[in-house]
UniProtKB/Swiss-Prot annotation:
Record gene name: plsX
Reaction it catalyzes: a fatty acyl-[ACP] + phosphate = an acyl phosphate + holo-[ACP]
Gene Ontology CC terms: cytoplasm
GO MF: phosphate:acyl-[acyl carrier protein] acyltransferase activity
The keyword Transferase appears for this protein: yes
Protein name as catalogued: Phosphate acyltransferase
Compartments where found: Cytoplasm
Amino acid sequence: MKIAIDAMGGDHAPKEIVIGAQKAIEHFQDIEITLVGNETLIRPYITNDERLSIIHTEQVIEATDEPVRAVRRKKEASMVLMANEVSEGRAHACISAGNTGALMAAGLFIVGRIDGIDRPALAPTLPTIDGKGFVLLDVGANVDARPEHILQYALMGAAYAEKVRGIHRPRIGLLNVGTEDQKGNELAKKTFQLIQDTSLNFVGNVEARDLLEGVADVVVTDGFTGNVALKTIEGTAIAVFSMLKSALTSNVVSKMAALALKPQLMQLKKKMDYAEYGGAALFGLRAPVIKAHGSSDAHAIFHAVRQAREMVVNDVIQTVKQSIAEIKQ
């Protein structure tokens, strides 16, 4: 199995990307990795090139580039060449921590959509109090959606949760303003009915305040609402940890308490760390495409590789195809 990685994408590229890739190769004996980027910058961080190859290019899609234009005009950009490796059959999956919009464009225009999927969805796995996490989609691949699009999100999310996360009959929830069946706008009401009419393990409407309680294994919504929910969760987590740090360093007594609680605090931090869950999968494409967080370190890249590998090994794409075909019948 070969995985292509954009070595130049992200805040800490190429160093953390290369280190994370090597860590994955050492851990998983059945993978090969192709790093795409400036070989002069990549090579100093390689300590073992076994099952590791480089495609050299000096062109990069920047965070400030307009996504679609960049993908179409920068034909030699590391992200574009990475996507080409997948579309031309030389790699089974790809990963980038670079420009999110550009990666979605590359996935759509180069890797291509699965037949029957109207719109891809961006789906991160977020932490929950019990440590199991949940998949949220869409978080911004498409800000608008129709009920049938969100139904497809539910099918794709269920396939991923079952095949990759090992959850038998994952619970599917629809993000809404209340838990009652008839709550929400027309989009929510029509989507509710569509999902309810399938064989999915649909638990109904779920509220944003209950997401981190683990109320569902997969939560679906339109991209606008999902992105707002994601950013709210991220911002709240940052604020809480900041307030906690301030309170525990305010005086000598609190500093002593912090020292005593250090193991528990580190455990909490690890439980809430996005890196433990890999990246956000771009569902609906013909091959696994993973968007790693822009600030990903080597640890996060390792888990993104693990995630991509599991999607390939468990044939998630084929499961999605079958699910969509059954709904279309």
